[in-house]
């Protein structure tokens, strides 16, 4: 876009030199040259910023995977950034949708429900998840508005469907600081365990996606295990065991 604008300015400068008379003949090209210089500086800074951001992402990816991030495809950088540092929940949802589709799951908007973001089906089975996607500045907690939708889906879901939460937590923190952070409040974890609802952080989902792409895990088998087991919490710290029961959350 910057190049096209500079080309337009150059064309107008030539046009001004040919068309205008006296002072205007010099003034118009001069203004165009000044504008071209300014646009060039802006483009340079934009390129430097994009390069610095990519270097930061490479560094953060190396911390997650402990592998050389230079092998990562160019288009994956946007996916990674919007998964781990999302700007809004809609972009995060689109990214999670793309990841599950890339892994081979059947994913749809679940228009038959008003309380779920996506329906994810495990291929060649009748098993399905009603997925909610959450974005959290800190840890996921009971007060997040999506939690009410999760329990609404619990009332509406079919027998072969299970609730699944994908949460991008601590979105302002670098990867190095997320490993030791709490990603879900104790109260919410207890409720999810009680109602057999699984919780996966975006950080953990990224790791699963990369392992699936490298053929290190059978991703369908992994999610079949999630489906068959009780409510578990999958975070950068690993799989947390079932927690002590908390007070009942009323599903009315």
Where in the sequence are the language-model features?
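Juxtamembrane "helix exit" motif at the C-terminal ends of alpha-helical transmembrane segments
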Residues: 10-18
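C-terminal, charge/polar-rich interaction regions
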Residues: 13, 63-67, 247-252
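Hydrophobic alpha-helical transmembrane segments
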Residues: 17-32
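Transmembrane alpha-helices and immediately adjacent membrane-cytoplasm interface residues
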Residues: 31-44
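Interdomain/boundary linker segments immediately adjacent to catalytic/signaling cores
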Residues: 45-87
């Amino acid at each position: 876009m910057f190049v096209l604008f500079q080309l337009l300015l150059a064309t107008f400068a030539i046009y001004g030199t040919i068309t205008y008379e006296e002072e205007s003949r010099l003034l118009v090209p001069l203004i165009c040259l000044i504008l071209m210089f300014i646009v060039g500086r802006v483009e340079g800074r934009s390129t430097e910023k994009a390069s610095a951001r990519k270097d930061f992402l490479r560094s953060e990816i190396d911390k997650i995977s402990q592998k050389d991030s230079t092998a990562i495809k160019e288009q994956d950088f946007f996916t990674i950034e919007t998964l781990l540092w999302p700007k809004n929940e809609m972009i995060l949802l689109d990214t999670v949708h793309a990841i599950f589709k890339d892994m081979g799951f059947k994913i749809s908007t679940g228009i038959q429900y008003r309380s779920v973001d996506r329906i994810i089906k495990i291929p060649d089975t009748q098993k399905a998840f009603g997925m909610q996607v959450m974005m959290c500045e800190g840890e996921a907690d009971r007060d997040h508005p999506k939690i009410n939708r999760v329990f609404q889906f619990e009332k509406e879901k079919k027998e072969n469907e299970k609730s699944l939460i994908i949460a991008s937590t601590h979105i302002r923190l670098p990867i190095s600081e997320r490993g030791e952070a709490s990603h879900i409040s104790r109260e919410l974890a207890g409720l999810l365990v009680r109602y057999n609802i699984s919780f996966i952080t975006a950080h953990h989902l990224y790791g699963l996606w990369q392992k699936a792409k490298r053929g290190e895990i059978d991703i369908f088998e992994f999610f079949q295990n999630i489906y068959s087991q009780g409510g578990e919490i999958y975070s950068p710290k690993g799989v947390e065991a079932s927690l002590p029961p908390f007070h009942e959350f009323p599903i009315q």
